[in-house]
Amino acid sequence: MKKRILALSLSAAMALSLAACGGGDGGTQPSGSQETTSGGASTTEVANKDKPLVWFNRQPSNSSTGELDMAALTFNDNTYYVGFDANQGAELQGTMIVDYIKAHAAEIDRNGDGVIGYVLAVGDIGHNDSIARTRGVRAALGTGVDKDGSIDSTPVGTNADGSSAIVQDGSIEVDGTSYTIRELASQEMKNSAGATWDAATAGNAIATWASSFGDQIDIVVSNNDGMGMSMFNAWSKENKVPTFGYDANSDAVAAIAEGYGGTISQHADVQAYLTLRVLRNALDGVDVDMGIGTEDDAGNVLTDDVFYYDEATRSYYALNVAVTAENYEQFLDSTVTYEPVSKQLDATAHPTKNVWLNIYNSADNFLGSTYQPLLQKYDDLLNLNVEYIAGDGQTESNITNRLGNPSAYDAFAINMVKTDNAASYTGILNQ
């Protein structure tokens, strides 16, 4: 098996970002809790608690401490998590911004005061991905402050004079000129209904910040492209202020040609494949690595430069790629499947199975515009009849209320609203 094993301590800091609302393709009628042979004949009953389960995008964990929920990750012998390497991606985003500053420092400093000021849109203060990205940016820019052994990821509110105890001023030297780097403002983008990662809230925030700071804002940074594009369209584009996001959504990648500074691809094409592939393998009764690190009967296989597997936490992680003006044209369509794993499985050897899959928030831009379209392409290739359930981004009950008949499905793919809430789902499967 081609896989790199990481320590549990590293995995605890990781999480993920994916699909959204929609409907599955046609296929067989729900097969209930029966296990079928390759010829389609039913054999033995499978209890819901023993059916394959994959968590994706939100890794079961304590949202305050980041400690992984191992009970959820090991719910049964066919339970896995699929996401991306949050720390590697966070570091990559920070490095991308620093590289941009080094190449454009003089023009970035809009008012010529020697201070490169940035504002930061924080997605969700309790989400591991959001925490990692905030820390990655602050670490790279030198604005991070240590708190209990890690960089403080708390939003600063406003920090016009650099006196905040949450962040500090950083510095960078470019062509013999020294610049101060200051986080002028940051806030969690949560709307009045409680939904986080909210693009509309980010659009309102940049208007407020622009009114307060004016040409002190030299860079806009966001934990994701949904919020980043909202700020870019509302203010940054017109004022020619580089904006950096995360997710490589198609609209953000296209906007690089219009001044969007850059984004990070979390290899959603690999993540979406892994999300359904681990279920396919469990349903086929083959090794979980089949079609992943080991070539399958159709020729599908991934190389270890695009993913790794952490056996201790039963977690698959896709690796990230920086998308900038130099390479953005390669990423313009984020819904194209990954070519090495785009071969159709034989329907006789891999008969159709029924999967219940939810997306935590139907309004999430990344999950809706990138991840779900990829899932819908892979479900055809893997002979899976997937029912897609779209949540409201606020409560688990909006989703779990639609899992009233788990016996109608052969496997489950779950994207929680909050990482703490795995038991809301496993409790249903245990009934």
Q: Can you say where each PLM-predicted feature lies in the sequence?
A:
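Positively charged n-region of N-terminal signal peptides that target proteins for export
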Residues: M1-L10
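A residue-level marker of the well-folded mature domains of exported/periplasmic proteins
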Residues: G26-Q431
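C-terminal motif of bacterial Sec signal peptides marking the signal peptidase cleavage site
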Residues: S17-A20
